[in-house]
From Swiss-Prot:
NCBIfam families: recomb_radB. It comes from Thermococcus kodakarensis (strain ATCC BAA-918 / JCM 12380 / KOD1) (Pyrococcus kodakaraensis (strain KOD1)). Gene3D superfamilies: P-loop containing nucleotide triphosphate hydrolases. It comes from the Archaea. Involved in DNA repair and in homologous recombination. May regulate the cleavage reactions of the branch-structured DNA. Has a very weak ATPase activity that is not stimulated by DNA. Binds DNA but does not promote DNA strands exchange. Keywords: ATP-binding, DNA damage, DNA recombination, DNA-binding, Nucleotide-binding. Belongs to the eukaryotic RecA-like protein family. RadB subfamily. One of its GO terms (molecular function) is ATP binding. This is DNA repair and recombination protein RadB. PANTHER family: DNA REPAIR AND RECOMBINATION PROTEIN RADB (PTHR22942:SF47), RECA/RAD51/RADA DNA STRAND-PAIRING FAMILY MEMBER (PTHR22942). The keyword Cell membrane does not apply. ATP binds at residues 27-34. GO terms for biological process: DNA recombination; DNA repair.
Amino acid sequence: MLSTGTKSLDSLLGGGFAPGVLTQVYGPYASGKTTLALQTGLLSGKKVAYVDTEGGFSPERLVQMAETRGLNPEEALSRFILFTPSDFKEQRRVIGSLKKTVDSNFALVVVDSITAHYRAEENRSGLIAELSRQLQVLLWIARKHNIPVIVINQVHFDSRTEMTKPVAEQTLGYRCKDILRLDKLPKPGLRVAVLERHRFRPEGLMAYFRITERGIEDVE
């Protein structure tokens, strides 16, 4: 298990992010998805393959998190191998290339987010199949190297159910055995994580956390 650095989230996930498994982390803007992925990679002590499709990866934020935790910021930055595909086609190429990039020196793969370029495409016919293929490649990497893969996802409003749901819910749900939803709460900095699916933990469990300079911390 790869620790998130917080007791509450580790407990919620059954010890942390599971190796050999795709974990979907989804939620609205600024709910803590990227911070959670950065912190998990930072504390792993090993290399992280980070596919940033939204421009959300912030070296400054990573440095801040490292410094406030007494870690070497330059060493931390050097461990994050960043990929920035500009469209869905390039995303396909980048994810395919990870099969050669990721080796035993890597502790984690993050795709942030898997659906941003998919949503930007005008003609989505056939793209669901391609999205499924990309997820299959990520699952192959997770299993081959026995490491976690965090797949960050966006949300959309479903007018039929009048609820916010993850984008491409069925496609991601088929491949992702663990699903974690993050939400903002009225109190500034406070967030809640809801376990929507897990291989052995009960669904619906919740954990509260704060977003601070250090990253994500337990609520005291």
